[in-house]
C-alpha cells in the first residue's frame, strides 16, 4: 500500500497558496467593491487576530477606500484608516473605532450587529441586526444615507426585515 501523505501535503499546500493568492487579489480589488461584494468574499478576508499576529497594524496600508481589509472576531469587515501600534493596543476593531472604517452589506443574510459610528454610517439599503421590541434579534435595512441612529429610533428610517435567519421581508416583493 502506498503512503499518500506527500500527496495530501501537496494538495494542502496548493490550497493554501490559492487562498493567499485570492486574499491578495481581493485586497487589491477591494477599493472598487461594495460592502455586499466584500461580504460575499469574506472567506478570503483575513481574520484580524491572525493579521495582527503576522504584521503590526502600524505597518499596514491605510486608506478610506483602499486601506488594509480584515474581519473582526465579531464578523465585521473593516478597513484600516488610522495607523496605530497593535502591540500596544491589541484590541479588536470594535474597541478602536477611530482606526477602522466598518463596511456594511445590503444582503440581509450578511447583516452584522448595529454600531453607531459617525465614521461608518449606514447608507440606504445597508443592513444590520438589532433587538426588536420583543427582544428577539431582527435584521433591519437603512432607509437613508448617513444613518448613525439605531433601528427603532423614533423618526429614523429603518425597515424591519424580520428575525435573523429569515425569511426576510423585501419591500419590492
Residue spans for each PLM region:
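Tryptophan-rich substrate-binding surfaces of secreted polymer-degrading and adhesive proteins
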Residues: 2-173
Amino acid at each position: 500500500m502506498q503512503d499518500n501523505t506527500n500527496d495530501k501535503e501537496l494538495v494542502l499546500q496548493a490550497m493554501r497558496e490559492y487562498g493567499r493568492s485570492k486574499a491578495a487579489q481581493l485586497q487589491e480589488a477591494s477599493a472598487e467593491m461594495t460592502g455586499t461584494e466584500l461580504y460575499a468574499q469574506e472567506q478570503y478576508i483575513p481574520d484580524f487576530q491572525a493579521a495582527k499576529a503576522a504584521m503590526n497594524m502600524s505597518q499596514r496600508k491605510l486608506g478610506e477606500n483602499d486601506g488594509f481589509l480584515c474581519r473582526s472576531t465579531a464578523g465585521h469587515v473593516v478597513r484600516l484608516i488610522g495607523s496605530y501600534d497593535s502591540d500596544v493596543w491589541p484590541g479588536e476593531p470594535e474597541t478602536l473605532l477611530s482606526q477602522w472604517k466598518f463596511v456594511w452589506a445590503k444582503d440581509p443574510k450578511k447583516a452584522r450587529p448595529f454600531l453607531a459610528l459617525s465614521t461608518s454610517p449606514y447608507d440606504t439599503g445597508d443592513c444590520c441586526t438589532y433587538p426588536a421590541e420583543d427582544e428577539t434579534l431582527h435584521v433591519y435595512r437603512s432607509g437613508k444615507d448617513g444613518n448613525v441612529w439605531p433601528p427603532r429610533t423614533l423618526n429614523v428610517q429603518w425597515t424591519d426585515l424580520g428575525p435573523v435567519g429569515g425569511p426576510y421581508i423585501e419591500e419590492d416583493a
